[in-house]
Amino acid sequence: DKAEMDVADVKDQQPESMELIDVPAEVDKGTSLKDFTSTLKAKVTYADGAVKEVAASDLEFVVVPDMETVGEKYVVATLKKTLLGKTADKTISANAKFSVVAGIKSITITKAPSRTKYYFYNSAALEGVDHTLAFDPTGMEVTAKYVEGEDAVLENSKLTFSRIPATPGKHEVTITTENGRTATVEVNVAESAVKAVTPSPVSLGAEDCSTAWWTEFTENMKIPAGETFEFNFTNYTSGANNYNNYVVILRKADLAEYAVVRADNYGWGNGYAACTPIGTQGDWATWLATMNGAKVKLFVTNCNNGTADIQAIVTGTDGSVTTQSYLGINTIDPSDLNVAFTVDSSHLKFNAASARKHYSRAHRR
């Protein structure tokens, strides 16, 4: 296949085939054909292989069998223009399936979510960061009242939810349907308790930083819902690559991973895509040069909303302070969140845990 081409660079070509894109799965009853099709597009392939995205204004549409009744429908688009917009020798067409649905008049929360008490911890790593929490719809049931027909329970995947400030107190979450109908639910947010923890073993990886990737690990440490574990350790690195430093693993007791995150603003796993990685390392070479012997204070919070936060404050060997956070790692089962560390041509020495006063961002002076 040839890449999508600039029409200015090619001779005129006849259309050969096309595919409709951006077709919504559902359209409210009463929507006009013009309004429905105004945002549709088609990906058109021409005789010599050129590919062009064509706007709705260059297409003609019909809906089969109609737009007036509820049910499954097909939108059929036709194109009568060449690549350069002249009348084509033949007309081509494409179709796509969608459904006309009775419009939602209002929504009501008919079953409360399972978890409405969330927790946060704002360390110094989040100075200047607008920290928010995700709403957890687990267990919630939202019922829609339609303009016509019977009431029905909506899938939570068809709803959107407002973010929640990571500040103590009661907060209102707005639940919104695709057609703009809203309802609200209240959640309570509290600052997490912090517990200093020392993993076993306290010395992880060979002292000469020769330990290979994914060969040595600390024990799994289970973080109860609503708690934050604090780890203090010295990080040693071979200095070969940015990723040859500490690595944090969030996983279930059976070792199924939620996410794996590194010291250099990078990670992966089912829960990683939803998170916000925030690193202040700046120039990588300068940062890496300070990591062999860097002091790390790292926090992991079980937010009890299906997410976890990781925050690290790193004091380099030159005295510079950088931070690394991963906020909102999701797919977390709050009753089965475990943290472990591993190394990759690196070595970690953990400090013994001791009771100490913990300063959150809000309490720093």
What kind of region is each of these model predictions?
Residues 273-297:
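Short, aromatic/His-centered strand-loop micro-motif at the edge of beta-sheets
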Residues 293-302, 310-312:
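Short tryptophan-centered beta-strand motifs in secreted/extracellular beta-sheet-rich domains
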Residues 14-50, 105-150:
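Solvent-exposed, low-complexity, repeat-rich "mucin-like" stalks and linkers
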Residues 203-273:
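Secretory/extracellular carbohydrate-interaction modules
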Residues 25-27, 50-85, 89-92, 149-187:
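Serine/threonine-rich, repeat-prone extracellular segments and beta-strand-based repeat modules
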Residues 315-338:
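Short, solvent-exposed beta-strand-to-loop segments that form ligand-recognition rims
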Residues 226, 331-365:
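Ligand-recognition surfaces built from glycine- and aromatic
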